[in-house]
Design a protein with these regions (language model features):
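N-terminal intrinsically disordered/low-complexity leader segments
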Residues: 1-19, 150-157
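C-terminal peripheral helix-coil segments that are non-catalytic and often amphipathic
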Residues: 1-7, 105, 140, 144-148, ...
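Generic hydrophobic, amphipathic alpha-helix propensity
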Residues: 16-28, 44, 69-77
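Helix-turn-helix
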Residues: 23, 31-64, 68
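Secondary-structure edge/capping motif, primarily at the C-terminal ends of alpha-helices
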Residues: 81-88, 117-121, 149, 178-182
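Hydrophobic alpha-helical connector segments
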Residues: 83-109
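Amphipathic alpha-helical segments used for helix-helix packing
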Residues: 108-128, 143-146, 176
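Amphipathic alpha-helical packing segments from all-alpha helical-bundle domains
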Residues: 125-151, 161-173, 196-199
């Protein structure tokens, strides 16, 4: 839907539309992560305090909104982890631990993000492929960054990609069990286990 031009109380139509989009994404995260609430456009609009007319201003449908939520979470995970690694110094082990620690810290700060991106997205048929694509992307990034930190091992690029996928897939299952409460572990224990696994795969 096109955004009408015009300034209201010093805020342009484009800025108001952008603010409404943020409200819808935030509301979708809240509704989608709540196991007691059915994720519908009506529920999301009610949570956001917006009419359905404004929903279609930003999104073509519910699946498009949920995909936007997933994309934002994935981008935040990638950026947060990369920044933490950059701040950890030159030691490979410190970088690995900082990167994984930042990811786990993000889940502690807002567990909804892990639940939505890793757990709940599996239940939405149209988002399963997007979830797979995002995990493959994160696996690729893990392969590139870990090899950069540790140096060449003589393995092929395909072997490194396979190791990255193995790590990310295992990490997804680990986080799922942790968020579901079927795995009892502290954040430090999760970070320790994941760091050992990643370093072991690339050495």
């Amino acid at each position: 839907m096109a955004v009408q031009s015009g300034v209201y109380r010093g805020v342009s139509a484009v800025e108001r539309a952008a603010a409404r989009r943020v409200r819808l994404v935030d509301a979708a995260l809240a509704v989608w992560a709540d196991p007691d609430t059915r994720t519908t456009m009506t529920a999301v609009c009610a949570e956001a305090g917006l009419s359905e007319r404004y929903f279609y201003e930003s999104f073509s449908g519910l699946d498009a909104l949920l995909e936007a939520v997933m994309n934002e979470i994935a981008a935040e995970i990638e950026e947060t982890s990369r920044h933490a690694a950059e701040q950890a110094g030159e030691e490979p082990e410190a970088r690995v631990r900082a990167s994984i620690g930042a990811f786990v810290g993000l889940l502690i700060e807002d567990p909804r993000k892990g639940r939505v991106a890793i757990v709940e997205s599996v239940a939405v048929p149209k988002l399963r492929q997007r979830r797979t694509d995002l995990l493959r992307h994160l696996a690729h990034q893990a392969a590139i960054e870990t090899r950069e930190w540790l140096g060449s091992s003589g393995r092929s690029e395909n072997e490194d990609e396979t190791a990255g996928l193995l790590f990310i897939g295992g990490m997804a299952e680990l986080v799922t069990a942790w968020l579901d409460g079927t795995l009892t572990a502290t954040a430090d224990e999760i970070v320790d286990a994941a760091s050992r696994a990643l370093l072991g795969l690339y050495r």
